[in-house]
Amino acid sequence: MKPILLQGHERSITQIKYNREGDLLFTVAKDPIVNVWYSVNGERLGTYMGHTGAVWCVDADWDTKHVLTGSADNSCRLWDCETGKQLALLKTNSAVRTCGFDFGGNIIMFSTDKQMGYQCFVSFFDLRDPSQIDSNEPYMRIPCNDSKITSAVWGPLGECIIAGHEGGELNQYSAKSGEVLVNVKEHSRQINDIQLSRDMTMFVTASKDNTAKLFDSTTLEHQKTFRTERPVNSAALSPNYDHVVLGGGQEAMDVTTTSTRIGKFEARFFHLAFEEEFGRVKGHFGPINSVAFHPDGKSYSSGGEDGYVRIHYFDPQYFEFEFEA
């Protein structure tokens, strides 16, 4: 399995994301550049220039017309995917940590950090109403008083958002009223990443408490746990197999003091039902910050602290592999 190496960032990768068809891969890092690549051969299509700080999150809408990015320069920006033109600039008081389009691509949500005396908020904008963008006034803003949101995704049918917090809590917020619909606490430490399954019936969380967990996306009922010895930075579900891939490694500040073998910088594959690890993929020099499955399930990508993104196309053995219970 020879990976395709994407060199487009000079700082560590913060998030990678495929569009719905999987022909494009968007990558953002702790530099101001937003890159988009052809996933089939790793050719760089272009960049979205405009941010002036680290970019924490990226999302593309259903038909890949628009791209949304959130950055530590206290802004969330909307781009035309094809031309790279900036369509909207939403200023915030603190860094934008998570962002996402709903299904129609009409409503965006993003969450801001609790820093410099400012509260953590989730803001909802309707892109069909230009006055909201021009006046920078969201139609709804949910304050998070307890611990700040570290990862968030739209729930099924765009009726709610599922948010993971610094303290390990999971909340489901209504996108209509803003109230908390469900609240659970299954993790003991910060939730770094949330990714939904292809059919949106379940999602996987990656946490600093060395585990990734599987939840039902409507009830937030805890289903499975995948245990490792290191903080998990990202986890993704395969669209056509019962497989989950975990990416992690130790804290960035501890990285230089250990050798790579001790650091455990592999991507780890677990079986969804049996919670058993069945494979590892080496490659990154440093922790893996973000993993994503291609929507066809034939490849996956990982972005690391080393600033590289690797696209791995699975060998034929992967598709013939039968898990022995």
UniProtKB/Swiss-Prot annotation:
Phosphorylated by TGF-beta type II receptor. There is a cross-link at K282 (Glycyl lysine isopeptide (Lys-Gly) (interchain with G-Cter in ubiquitin)). SMART domains: WD40 (SM00320). One of its GO terms (biological process) is cytoplasmic translational initiation. GO terms for cellular component: eukaryotic 43S preinitiation complex; eukaryotic 48S preinitiation complex; eukaryotic translation initiation factor 3 complex; eukaryotic translation initiation factor 3 complex, eIF3m. It comes from the Eukaryota. WD repeats lie at residues 8-47, 50-91, 144-183, 186-225, 283-324. Its main location: cytoplasm. The modification Phosphotyrosine is found at Y308. Keywords: Acetylation, Cytoplasm, Initiation factor, Isopeptide bond, Phosphoprotein, Protein biosynthesis, Repeat, Ubl conjugation, WD repeat. Pfam families: EIF3I. The modification N6-acetyllysine is found at K264. The modification Phosphothreonine is found at T219. InterPro entries: eIF3i (IPR027525), WD40/YVTN_repeat-like_dom_sf (IPR015943), WD40_repeat_CS (IPR019775), WD40_repeat_dom_sf (IPR036322), WD40_rpt (IPR001680). It is found in: Cytoplasm. One of its GO terms (molecular function) is translation initiation factor activity. Belongs to the eIF-3 subunit I family. Component of the eukaryotic translation initiation factor 3 (eIF-3) complex, which is required for several steps in the initiation of protein synthesis. The eIF-3 complex associates with the 40S ribosome and facilitates the recruitment of eIF-1, eIF-1A, eIF-2:GTP:methionyl-tRNAi and eIF-5 to form the 43S pre-initiation complex (43S PIC). The eIF-3 complex stimulates mRNA recruitment to the 43S PIC and scanning of the mRNA for AUG recognition. Component of the eukaryotic translation initiation factor 3 (eIF-3) complex, which is composed of 13 subunits: EIF3A, EIF3B, EIF3C, EIF3D, EIF3E, EIF3F, EIF3G, EIF3H, EIF3I, EIF3J, EIF3K, EIF3L and EIF3M. The eIF-3 complex appears to include 3 stable modules: module A is composed of EIF3A, EIF3B, EIF3G and EIF3I; module B is composed of EIF3F, EIF3H, and EIF3M; and module C is composed of EIF3C, EIF3D, EIF3E, EIF3K and EIF3L. EIF3C of module C binds EIF3B of module A and EIF3H of module B, thereby linking the three modules. EIF3J is a labile subunit that binds to the eIF-3 complex via EIF3B. This is Eukaryotic translation initiation factor 3 subunit I. It comes from Bos taurus (Bovine). The lineage of its organism: Eukaryota, Metazoa, Chordata, Craniata, Vertebrata. The gene is EIF3I.
